[in-house]
Amino acid sequence: MTITIGQYVEKRGLFDNVDDWLRRERFVFVGWSGLLLFPCAYMALGGWLTGTTFVTSWYTHGLATSYLEGCNFLTAAVSTPANSMAHSLLFLWGPEAQGDLTRWFQLGGLWPFVALHGAFSLIGFMLRQFEIAQSLKLRPYNAIAFSAPIAVFVSVFLIYPLGQAGWFFAPSFGVAAIFRFILFFQGFHNWTLNPFHMMGVAGVLGAALLCAIHGATVENTLFEDGDGANTFRAFNPTQAEETYSMVTANRFWSQIFGVAFSNKRWLHFFMLFVPVTGLWMSAIGVVGLALNLRAYDFVSQEIRAAEDPEFETFYTKNILLNEGIRAWMAAQDQPHEKLTFPEEVLPRGNAL
Protein backbone atom coordinates (compact mmCIF):
# COMPACT_ATOMS: atom_id res chain seq x y z
CA MET A 1 0.00 0.00 0.00
CA THR A 2 1.31 3.44 -0.94
CA ILE A 3 0.52 6.52 1.14
CA THR A 4 1.11 9.86 -0.53
CA ILE A 5 1.70 12.80 1.80
CA GLY A 6 1.17 16.19 0.24
CA GLN A 7 -0.36 19.59 0.79
CA TYR A 8 -3.98 20.19 -0.17
CA VAL A 9 -4.23 22.87 -2.80
CA GLU A 10 -7.58 24.64 -2.96
CA LYS A 11 -8.94 25.02 -6.46
CA ARG A 12 -9.42 28.68 -7.21
CA GLY A 13 -11.56 29.89 -10.05
CA LEU A 14 -11.76 33.15 -11.91
CA PHE A 15 -14.23 34.62 -9.41
CA ASP A 16 -11.83 34.00 -6.50
CA ASN A 17 -8.95 35.63 -8.35
CA VAL A 18 -11.05 38.67 -9.28
CA ASP A 19 -12.33 38.89 -5.70
CA ASP A 20 -8.76 38.84 -4.37
CA TRP A 21 -7.70 41.60 -6.76
CA LEU A 22 -10.72 43.82 -6.07
CA ARG A 23 -10.55 43.51 -2.29
CA ARG A 24 -6.77 43.76 -1.97
CA GLU A 25 -5.49 46.40 0.44
CA ARG A 26 -4.28 49.39 -1.53
CA PHE A 27 -4.17 53.18 -1.21
CA VAL A 28 -7.59 53.50 -2.87
CA PHE A 29 -9.79 50.49 -2.11
CA VAL A 30 -11.68 49.24 -5.18
CA GLY A 31 -13.93 46.37 -4.11
CA TRP A 32 -16.95 45.02 -5.92
CA SER A 33 -18.76 48.28 -5.21
CA GLY A 34 -16.02 50.10 -7.11
CA LEU A 35 -17.15 48.41 -10.32
CA LEU A 36 -20.32 50.50 -10.01
CA LEU A 37 -18.95 53.58 -8.24
CA PHE A 38 -15.87 54.53 -10.26
CA PRO A 39 -17.22 54.26 -13.84
CA CYS A 40 -20.52 55.94 -12.95
CA ALA A 41 -18.87 58.76 -10.97
CA TYR A 42 -16.41 59.31 -13.83
CA MET A 43 -19.25 59.49 -16.37
CA ALA A 44 -21.43 61.77 -14.21
CA LEU A 45 -18.63 64.23 -13.42
CA GLY A 46 -17.30 64.12 -16.97
CA GLY A 47 -20.76 64.75 -18.42
CA TRP A 48 -21.31 67.68 -16.08
CA LEU A 49 -17.93 69.25 -16.88
CA THR A 50 -18.56 68.77 -20.59
CA GLY A 51 -22.02 70.34 -20.43
CA THR A 52 -21.04 73.34 -18.34
CA THR A 53 -18.02 73.99 -20.55
CA PHE A 54 -19.56 74.25 -24.02
CA VAL A 55 -23.10 72.81 -24.32
CA THR A 56 -25.87 75.37 -24.82
CA SER A 57 -29.45 75.19 -23.54
CA TRP A 58 -30.76 77.50 -26.23
CA TYR A 59 -32.77 74.73 -27.90
CA THR A 60 -34.32 73.40 -24.67
CA HIS A 61 -34.78 76.44 -22.42
CA GLY A 62 -33.78 79.42 -24.52
CA LEU A 63 -30.86 79.98 -22.15
CA ALA A 64 -27.08 80.27 -22.23
CA THR A 65 -25.66 77.77 -19.72
CA SER A 66 -21.99 77.19 -20.59
CA TYR A 67 -18.65 78.89 -20.03
CA LEU A 68 -18.29 79.16 -23.80
CA GLU A 69 -21.39 81.37 -23.91
CA GLY A 70 -20.22 83.63 -21.08
CA CYS A 71 -21.54 81.92 -17.94
CA ASN A 72 -19.49 81.55 -14.77
CA PHE A 73 -19.35 78.73 -12.20
CA LEU A 74 -22.53 79.91 -10.48
CA THR A 75 -24.62 80.35 -13.64
CA ALA A 76 -23.42 77.46 -15.82
CA ALA A 77 -25.51 74.29 -15.78
CA VAL A 78 -26.38 71.03 -17.48
CA SER A 79 -30.03 71.78 -18.14
CA THR A 80 -32.96 69.41 -18.46
CA PRO A 81 -34.16 68.15 -21.86
CA ALA A 82 -36.87 69.88 -23.83
CA ASN A 83 -40.42 69.40 -22.55
CA SER A 84 -41.31 67.62 -25.80
CA MET A 85 -38.87 64.83 -24.86
CA ALA A 86 -41.16 63.87 -21.94
CA HIS A 87 -39.55 60.98 -20.02
CA SER A 88 -37.33 59.65 -22.79
CA LEU A 89 -33.96 58.39 -21.57
CA LEU A 90 -32.45 60.11 -24.61
CA PHE A 91 -29.86 57.48 -25.45
CA LEU A 92 -27.24 58.76 -27.87
CA TRP A 93 -28.19 55.92 -30.22
CA GLY A 94 -31.93 56.41 -29.66
CA PRO A 95 -34.55 57.65 -32.13
CA GLU A 96 -34.17 61.27 -30.98
CA ALA A 97 -30.42 61.82 -31.48
CA GLN A 98 -29.80 58.90 -33.89
CA GLY A 99 -26.12 58.73 -32.98
CA ASP A 100 -25.48 62.42 -33.69
CA LEU A 101 -23.52 63.80 -30.70
CA THR A 102 -24.25 67.44 -31.54
CA ARG A 103 -27.98 66.76 -31.81
CA TRP A 104 -27.83 64.79 -28.54
CA PHE A 105 -26.30 67.82 -26.79
CA GLN A 106 -28.91 70.15 -28.31
CA LEU A 107 -31.82 67.97 -27.16
CA GLY A 108 -30.50 67.91 -23.58
CA GLY A 109 -29.24 64.33 -23.62
CA LEU A 110 -26.51 65.14 -21.10
CA TRP A 111 -29.06 65.68 -18.30
CA PRO A 112 -30.42 62.09 -18.06
CA PHE A 113 -26.84 60.88 -18.64
CA VAL A 114 -25.56 62.84 -15.62
CA ALA A 115 -28.65 62.16 -13.48
CA LEU A 116 -28.67 58.38 -13.93
CA HIS A 117 -24.90 57.93 -13.66
CA GLY A 118 -24.93 60.25 -10.64
CA ALA A 119 -27.66 58.21 -8.93
CA PHE A 120 -25.82 54.93 -9.53
CA SER A 121 -22.52 56.42 -8.35
CA LEU A 122 -24.17 57.50 -5.08
CA ILE A 123 -25.58 53.99 -4.65
CA GLY A 124 -22.11 52.60 -5.42
CA PHE A 125 -20.61 54.84 -2.73
CA MET A 126 -23.14 53.55 -0.19
CA LEU A 127 -22.33 49.94 -1.18
CA ARG A 128 -18.63 50.82 -0.79
CA GLN A 129 -19.29 51.78 2.82
CA PHE A 130 -21.16 48.50 3.36
CA GLU A 131 -18.31 46.52 1.80
CA ILE A 132 -15.51 48.16 3.77
CA ALA A 133 -17.52 47.98 7.01
CA GLN A 134 -18.10 44.25 6.44
CA SER A 135 -14.40 43.60 5.79
CA LEU A 136 -13.46 45.49 8.98
CA LYS A 137 -16.23 43.80 11.01
CA LEU A 138 -17.99 47.12 11.61
CA ARG A 139 -21.68 47.89 11.83
CA PRO A 140 -23.18 49.38 8.62
CA TYR A 141 -24.48 52.65 10.11
CA ASN A 142 -22.35 54.83 7.80
CA ALA A 143 -24.03 53.27 4.79
CA ILE A 144 -27.45 53.57 6.41
CA ALA A 145 -26.81 57.26 7.09
CA PHE A 146 -25.74 57.82 3.48
CA SER A 147 -29.09 56.44 2.32
CA ALA A 148 -30.59 59.82 3.32
CA PRO A 149 -28.83 62.01 0.71
CA ILE A 150 -29.44 59.24 -1.85
CA ALA A 151 -33.16 59.37 -1.04
CA VAL A 152 -33.18 63.15 -1.49
CA PHE A 153 -31.28 62.99 -4.79
CA VAL A 154 -33.50 60.26 -6.24
CA SER A 155 -36.73 61.92 -5.12
CA VAL A 156 -35.82 65.40 -6.40
CA PHE A 157 -34.01 64.56 -9.63
CA LEU A 158 -35.81 61.37 -10.71
CA ILE A 159 -39.13 60.71 -8.95
CA TYR A 160 -40.43 64.30 -9.04
CA PRO A 161 -40.03 64.74 -12.83
CA LEU A 162 -41.42 61.22 -13.36
CA GLY A 163 -44.61 62.39 -11.67
CA GLN A 164 -44.70 65.55 -13.79
CA ALA A 165 -44.86 65.97 -17.56
CA GLY A 166 -41.20 65.14 -18.20
CA TRP A 167 -37.55 65.56 -17.22
CA PHE A 168 -37.97 69.23 -18.20
CA PHE A 169 -39.43 69.96 -14.74
CA ALA A 170 -36.50 68.46 -12.81
CA PRO A 171 -33.70 70.69 -11.49
CA SER A 172 -30.86 71.40 -13.89
CA PHE A 173 -27.36 70.65 -12.60
CA GLY A 174 -26.05 74.08 -11.68
CA VAL A 175 -26.01 76.49 -8.74
CA ALA A 176 -28.32 79.21 -10.12
CA ALA A 177 -30.41 76.48 -11.75
CA ILE A 178 -31.06 74.89 -8.35
CA PHE A 179 -32.06 78.30 -6.96
CA ARG A 180 -34.56 78.67 -9.81
CA PHE A 181 -35.94 75.23 -9.01
CA ILE A 182 -36.39 76.19 -5.35
CA LEU A 183 -38.42 79.24 -6.41
CA PHE A 184 -40.43 77.00 -8.73
CA PHE A 185 -41.15 74.57 -5.87
CA GLN A 186 -42.35 77.43 -3.68
CA GLY A 187 -44.51 79.11 -6.30
CA PHE A 188 -46.17 75.98 -7.68
CA HIS A 189 -46.24 73.73 -4.58
CA ASN A 190 -46.03 76.11 -1.57
CA TRP A 191 -43.16 73.89 -0.44
CA THR A 192 -42.18 75.91 2.65
CA LEU A 193 -45.59 75.23 4.21
CA ASN A 194 -45.31 71.49 3.57
CA PRO A 195 -44.94 69.53 6.86
CA PHE A 196 -42.35 67.21 5.30
CA HIS A 197 -40.21 70.22 4.39
CA MET A 198 -40.59 71.47 7.96
CA MET A 199 -39.36 68.12 9.28
CA GLY A 200 -36.44 68.24 6.86
CA VAL A 201 -35.43 71.74 7.99
CA ALA A 202 -35.72 70.67 11.63
CA GLY A 203 -33.52 67.64 10.90
CA VAL A 204 -30.78 69.50 9.02
CA LEU A 205 -30.60 72.54 11.31
CA GLY A 206 -31.03 70.36 14.39
CA ALA A 207 -28.14 68.18 13.21
CA ALA A 208 -25.95 71.26 12.71
CA LEU A 209 -26.78 72.39 16.25
CA LEU A 210 -26.05 68.93 17.69
CA CYS A 211 -22.77 68.77 15.77
CA ALA A 212 -21.65 72.17 17.08
CA ILE A 213 -22.68 71.36 20.66
CA HIS A 214 -21.02 67.94 20.56
CA GLY A 215 -17.75 69.25 19.12
CA ALA A 216 -17.60 72.11 21.61
CA THR A 217 -18.39 69.82 24.56
CA VAL A 218 -15.69 67.33 23.62
CA GLU A 219 -13.16 70.14 23.21
CA ASN A 220 -14.25 71.58 26.58
CA THR A 221 -13.69 68.32 28.46
CA LEU A 222 -10.45 67.04 26.88
CA PHE A 223 -7.92 65.57 29.28
CA GLU A 224 -4.71 67.59 29.58
CA ASP A 225 -2.49 64.53 29.47
CA GLY A 226 0.22 65.65 27.05
CA ASP A 227 2.77 68.46 26.88
CA GLY A 228 0.19 71.18 27.30
CA ALA A 229 -3.47 72.05 27.02
CA ASN A 230 -3.17 72.96 23.35
CA THR A 231 -5.80 70.98 21.44
CA PHE A 232 -3.44 70.06 18.61
CA ARG A 233 -0.33 69.15 20.66
CA ALA A 234 -1.51 67.63 23.90
CA PHE A 235 -2.62 64.22 22.68
CA ASN A 236 -1.09 61.24 21.01
CA PRO A 237 -3.43 60.29 18.14
CA THR A 238 -2.81 56.59 18.80
CA GLN A 239 -3.50 56.55 22.55
CA ALA A 240 -5.88 53.77 23.56
CA GLU A 241 -7.83 55.51 26.32
CA GLU A 242 -10.52 58.10 25.77
CA THR A 243 -9.44 61.70 25.57
CA TYR A 244 -12.43 63.48 27.10
CA SER A 245 -14.57 63.17 30.20
CA MET A 246 -18.15 62.05 29.59
CA VAL A 247 -18.88 62.48 33.31
CA THR A 248 -17.82 66.13 33.24
CA ALA A 249 -19.79 66.75 30.05
CA ASN A 250 -22.88 65.16 31.61
CA ARG A 251 -22.53 67.35 34.68
CA PHE A 252 -22.14 70.49 32.55
CA TRP A 253 -25.28 69.91 30.46
CA SER A 254 -27.26 68.75 33.47
CA GLN A 255 -26.54 72.15 35.00
CA ILE A 256 -27.42 73.97 31.74
CA PHE A 257 -30.63 72.18 30.71
CA GLY A 258 -31.47 69.99 33.68
CA VAL A 259 -31.11 66.91 31.42
CA ALA A 260 -28.16 65.42 29.56
CA PHE A 261 -27.15 62.29 27.65
CA SER A 262 -25.88 59.69 30.08
CA ASN A 263 -24.06 57.42 27.64
CA LYS A 264 -22.20 57.87 24.38
CA ARG A 265 -24.16 55.28 22.41
CA TRP A 266 -27.49 57.04 22.85
CA LEU A 267 -25.87 60.43 22.22
CA HIS A 268 -24.28 59.38 18.94
CA PHE A 269 -27.33 57.45 17.79
CA PHE A 270 -29.37 60.62 18.31
CA MET A 271 -26.84 62.58 16.22
CA LEU A 272 -27.30 59.96 13.49
CA PHE A 273 -31.09 59.81 13.81
CA VAL A 274 -31.89 63.54 13.57
CA PRO A 275 -30.36 64.42 10.16
CA VAL A 276 -31.11 61.06 8.52
CA THR A 277 -34.76 61.18 9.55
CA GLY A 278 -35.03 64.82 8.45
CA LEU A 279 -33.63 64.09 4.99
CA TRP A 280 -35.84 61.03 4.58
CA MET A 281 -38.91 63.10 5.51
CA SER A 282 -37.94 65.69 2.89
CA ALA A 283 -37.58 62.94 0.29
CA ILE A 284 -41.03 61.59 1.16
CA GLY A 285 -42.44 65.11 0.82
CA VAL A 286 -40.94 65.52 -2.66
CA VAL A 287 -42.49 62.21 -3.71
CA GLY A 288 -45.80 63.71 -2.60
CA LEU A 289 -45.14 66.77 -4.76
CA ALA A 290 -44.49 64.48 -7.72
CA LEU A 291 -48.13 63.46 -7.29
CA ASN A 292 -49.17 67.11 -6.82
CA LEU A 293 -50.24 66.61 -3.20
CA ARG A 294 -50.87 69.96 -1.58
CA ALA A 295 -49.33 71.49 1.54
CA TYR A 296 -51.39 73.06 4.31
CA ASP A 297 -54.27 75.18 3.00
CA PHE A 298 -55.82 77.68 5.40
CA VAL A 299 -58.81 78.39 3.21
CA SER A 300 -60.73 80.26 5.91
CA GLN A 301 -57.97 82.90 6.01
CA GLU A 302 -57.98 83.19 2.22
CA ILE A 303 -61.76 83.67 2.13
CA ARG A 304 -61.67 86.28 4.89
CA ALA A 305 -58.78 88.12 3.20
CA ALA A 306 -60.76 88.19 -0.04
CA GLU A 307 -63.81 89.64 1.75
CA ASP A 308 -62.02 92.05 4.10
CA PRO A 309 -59.30 94.28 2.58
CA GLU A 310 -57.99 95.09 6.08
CA PHE A 311 -57.43 91.44 7.01
CA GLU A 312 -54.08 89.98 6.02
CA THR A 313 -51.79 87.33 7.53
CA PHE A 314 -48.32 86.16 6.61
CA TYR A 315 -50.04 83.12 5.09
CA THR A 316 -52.28 85.16 2.76
CA LYS A 317 -49.31 87.37 1.84
CA ASN A 318 -47.32 84.25 0.90
CA ILE A 319 -50.20 82.92 -1.18
CA LEU A 320 -50.18 86.17 -3.17
CA LEU A 321 -46.41 85.90 -3.58
CA ASN A 322 -46.85 82.35 -4.88
CA GLU A 323 -49.40 83.57 -7.41
CA GLY A 324 -46.92 86.21 -8.54
CA ILE A 325 -44.20 83.58 -8.93
CA ARG A 326 -46.51 81.40 -11.02
CA ALA A 327 -47.75 84.22 -13.24
CA TRP A 328 -44.28 85.57 -13.91
CA MET A 329 -42.34 82.33 -13.93
CA ALA A 330 -44.58 80.20 -16.12
CA ALA A 331 -44.05 82.38 -19.19
CA GLN A 332 -40.31 82.76 -18.48
CA ASP A 333 -39.76 79.13 -17.57
CA GLN A 334 -41.83 77.47 -20.28
CA PRO A 335 -41.34 79.63 -23.40
CA HIS A 336 -42.45 76.75 -25.63
CA GLU A 337 -45.97 77.02 -24.18
CA LYS A 338 -46.24 80.65 -25.38
CA LEU A 339 -48.19 81.55 -22.24
CA THR A 340 -49.68 85.05 -22.05
CA PHE A 341 -51.25 86.69 -19.00
CA PRO A 342 -53.31 89.89 -18.86
CA GLU A 343 -51.32 92.87 -17.63
CA GLU A 344 -53.49 93.24 -14.53
CA VAL A 345 -52.49 89.84 -13.11
CA LEU A 346 -48.74 90.28 -13.54
CA PRO A 347 -46.78 91.41 -10.45
CA ARG A 348 -45.51 94.99 -10.50
CA GLY A 349 -42.72 95.67 -8.01
CA ASN A 350 -43.94 95.25 -4.44
CA ALA A 351 -47.60 95.73 -5.30
CA LEU A 352 -49.02 92.26 -5.83
UniProtKB/Swiss-Prot annotation:
Pheophytin a binds at residues 129, 142. Its EC number is 1.10.3.9. The chain crosses the membrane at residues 40-60, 124-140, 152-165, 207-227, 278-294. Keywords: Acetylation, Chlorophyll, Chloroplast, Chromophore, Electron transport, Iron, Magnesium, Membrane, Metal-binding, Oxidoreductase, Phosphoprotein, Photosynthesis, Photosystem II, Plastid, Thylakoid, Transmembrane, Transmembrane helix, Transport. One of its GO terms (biological process) is photosynthetic electron transport in photosystem II. Chlorophyll a ChlzD2 binds at residue 117. It is a multi-pass membrane protein. It is found in: Plastid, Chloroplast thylakoid membrane. Coiled coil: none annotated. It catalyses: 2 a plastoquinone + 4 hnu + 2 H2O = 2 a plastoquinol + O2. This is Photosystem II D2 protein. The lineage of its organism: Eukaryota, Viridiplantae, Chlorophyta, core chlorophytes, Chlorophyceae.
